[in-house]
Structure formats: structure tokens, C-alpha cells
């Protein structure tokens, strides 16, 4: 109950790929956040309807290029095969760095930790990622732990769809602190 009070009205933005975001990695954390009173905005590289790998259809609220980090308490990068569109994207890197520099919560799940790793956020930080992208985050300086969900300060990473629920719960807990 107390955690619910403390996160009520906080704001999170979840960044999804235009195509092939991973359904549960958006929908499960979003549900957990909203159930706890967090206001969630969905952002993507297009305002057209986005399609998940398993067929979920989601209409983004805003373009990710229009994200103003100051408006949010948490910035969350959602995974799925399409998430690689942000790996080398300078705007995605700027959003990650702006959020980190402002001590906002930064979350990334599945292959999305590569985006924040390439932005420089995971250097000497404990982190996890999807099995196929372990070397990508290690080469960017991350200390890979292999955990389902890993937290190092304001940065929360998760390994994939099976960890989506726990990822959401960990974000809520961090927002309540």
C-alpha cells in the first residue's frame, strides 16, 4: 500500500520499436506500473500503429524524438528484435544520457540494454541482457551478471520476456524510493 502511494502520479516513458517490439516486455511492465498509479507514455520512431513480435498492436502516444526527459521519472527501452533500430541511434543515446545525468530511472530489457550500453551508461555497471547480446554489452564495458533482472543504482536491466513482470516490479520499487 505504501509503495502504491509513493509512486502514484509518477511518469514513465516506454520506447518501443516501430515493428517487432516484444509484446510482454511492453505490456507486462506497463500493466504493473499503471496498476501502481504510474502514468505511462508509449514512444516510438513513428506514430503509426506498432506491431509486436506476437501480434500486439499499439498506437504510440509520442515520437521518441520528442521525448523531454524532464517530464518523466523513468525512461524504459523495450526489447524485441526490432529494438535494434535504436542501438546506434544518436537520439536514443541522448535520451539515455539525459535521463542518467538527471538521475532518472533508466530501464532496458532483452536486447535493448545494447542501446544504453552504446550510449555509455553501462560502463563498470552490473547489467543483464538477452543471451544473444551479452558480448555487445560486455564490449561496451558492462559487468554482465546473467541475472533475470539486475539493478545498479538508477539503471535496471532485464534478460527478456520471461523477466518482464519482475522488471516492472523492480521499476515500481525503485520509483518508490
Label each region the model flagged.
Residues 127:
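Anionic-ligand binding patches
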Residues 2-102, 106, 115-121, 134-146, ...:
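Extended, subdomain-level signal for the structured scaffold at the beginning of enzyme domains
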Residues 110:
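Catalytic nucleophile serine of serine hydrolases
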Amino acid at each position: 500500500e505504501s509503495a502504491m502511494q509513493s509512486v502514484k502520479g509518477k511518469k514513465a516513458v516506454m520506447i518501443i520499436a516501430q515493428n517487432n517490439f516484444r509484446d510482454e516486455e511492453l505490456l507486462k511492465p506497463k500493466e504493473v506500473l499503471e496498476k501502481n498509479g504510474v502514468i505511462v507514455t508509449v514512444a516510438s520512431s513513428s506514430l503509426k500503429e506498432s506491431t509486436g513480435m506476437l501480434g500486439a498492436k499499439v498506437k504510440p502516444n509520442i515520437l521518441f524524438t520528442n521525448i523531454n526527459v524532464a517530464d518523466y521519472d523513468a525512461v524504459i527501452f523495450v526489447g524485441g528484435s526490432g529494438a535494434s533500430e535504436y542501438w546506434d541511434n544518436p537520439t536514443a543515446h541522448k535520451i539515455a544520457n539525459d535521463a542518467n545525468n538527471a538521475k532518472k530511472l533508466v530501464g532496458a530489457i532483452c536486447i535493448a540494454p545494447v542501446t544504453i550500453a552504446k550510449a555509455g551508461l553501462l560502463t563498470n555497471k552490473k547489467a543483464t541482457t538477452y543471451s544473444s547480446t551479452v558480448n555487445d554489452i560486455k564490449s561496451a564495458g558492462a559487468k554482465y551478471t546473467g541475472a533475470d533482472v539486475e539493478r545498479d543504482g538508477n539503471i535496471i536491466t532485464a534478460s527478456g520476456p520471461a523477466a518482464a513482470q519482475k522488471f516492472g516490479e523492480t521499476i515500481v520499487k525503485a520509483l518508490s524510493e
